[in-house]
Amino acid sequence: MARAIWSGAISFGLVNIPVKLFSAVQKKTVRFHQLDAKTGSRIQQKRVNPQTGEEVPYEQLVKGFEVSPDTYVVVEPDELAAIEPKKTHTIDIEDFVQIDEIDPIYYDHPYYLAPGTGAGKAYSLLLAALRDTERVGIARVVIRSKEQLVAIRPRDDVLTMETLLFGDEVVSPSDLGELPDPDEV
């Protein structure tokens, strides 16, 4: 049986529907490791300063953001904590749009939403309303310390939640170079 990876509530207006979140996909990939050909032992990665050639202990590592080639701004842990979104355990629906208003290129990762304890009727009502009106709920949720834009939509007898890419994360076709003119085919 699948295990919930998050629990919270779908919220819009005065409505609050407890739900559990499950990943809708299980990627089947083979993971290879680097091994020593002579002994078959797994190789370890070491943190080495390229300027000194010395190994850097974990306690000396800091996070930095590259502002230009080889120029970094160090970001302190308290600065990272200050910008971390507040965990609310709520999927806040901000709008409802027609299903065909979302270009599929913006869909990122699918999840299933199952009703929480005592939420069966409210869950079923939302599922039926979205299905009957062919609408999708556009919402925000914090998962693993990251705020996500998501779409809540019906799929058969279950609500799905798909993380959405922001516009600046999608590569424009104009960045691909010269494409053939479709009128000249």
PLM-predicted stretches and their roles:
Residues 1-185:
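Boundary segments of small protein-protein interaction reader/adaptor domains
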